């Protein structure tokens, strides 16, 4: 089986994968879930990509790299420096080469759901429950609230993406059909128009590793074995 590296997004730390990881280990996959730095306000895309790269064993040959939400933005930088089996964008953002993230937002189409604008789920419990954990069981939602972070993305948002050529690597995109943060319509569009792939859909909110870990593990395991 392959090594699956799970990269958390901007609102939860690496503990967010604790329900998913055991399901991926059942068929024999090895799992990594690196922690991105939350105490580096000047961190840009290259810094986050370096953290991911440094977490990968040098001798690992069949690496499936999965990123959730904002961290999808860093995957091409990793793939440009390390041979990978495939990239999996899980309800994730993608960079537009030659543009900053803010440039991409202005150019459209709309990436985020309108009601998500200005919300801070780290400080606002109601926002976290409504936008991130609305389809989780009460027990899981209570635990998930303890994993909240805010990843510094100021430089990521304003810098021109530091890559001039998209890496040659197989890619897949998982759309969360009940997502209340990242627009499912945008996710479907970006999968087809930017990655050139048919999106895979899960009937879940933004965090299916919490609400549907068994289903998500099945999808990821299949991708890790067939790509």
Where in this protein do the model-derived segments appear?
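Conserved HGGG/HGGXW glycine-rich cap/lid loop of the alpha/beta-hydrolase fold
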Residues: 2-41, 61
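Post-His helix in hydrolase/transferase enzymes
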Residues: 48, 210-224
């Amino acid at each position: 089986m392959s090594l699956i590296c799970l990269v958390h997004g901007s609102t939860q730390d690496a503990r967010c994968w604790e329900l998913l990881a055991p399901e991926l280990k059942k068929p024999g996959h090895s799992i990594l879930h690196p922690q991105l730095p939350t105490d580096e306000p000047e961190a840009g895309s290259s810094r986050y990509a370096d953290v991911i790269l440094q977490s990968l064993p040098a001798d690992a040959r069949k690496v499936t790299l999965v990123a959730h939400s904002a961290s999808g933005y860093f995957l091409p930088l990793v793939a440009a420096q390390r041979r990978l089996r495939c990239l999996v964008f899980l309800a994730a953002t993608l960079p537009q080469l030659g543009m900053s993230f803010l440039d991409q937002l202005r150019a459209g189409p709309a990436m985020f759901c309108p009601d998500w604008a200005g919300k801070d789920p780290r400080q606002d419990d109601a926002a976290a429950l409504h936008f991130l954990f609305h389809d989780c069981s009460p027990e899981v939602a209570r635990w998930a609230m303890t994993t909240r972070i805010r990843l510094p993305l100021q430089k990521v948002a304003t810098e021109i993406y530091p890559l001039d050529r998209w890496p040659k690597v197989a890619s897949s995109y998982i759309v969360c059909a009940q997502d209340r943060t990242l627009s499912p319509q945008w996710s479907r569009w970006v999968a087809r128009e930017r990655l050139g792939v048919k999106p895979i859909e899960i009937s879940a909110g933004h965090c299916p590793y919490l609400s549907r870990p068994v289903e998500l593990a099945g999808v990821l395991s299949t991708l890790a074995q067939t790509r």
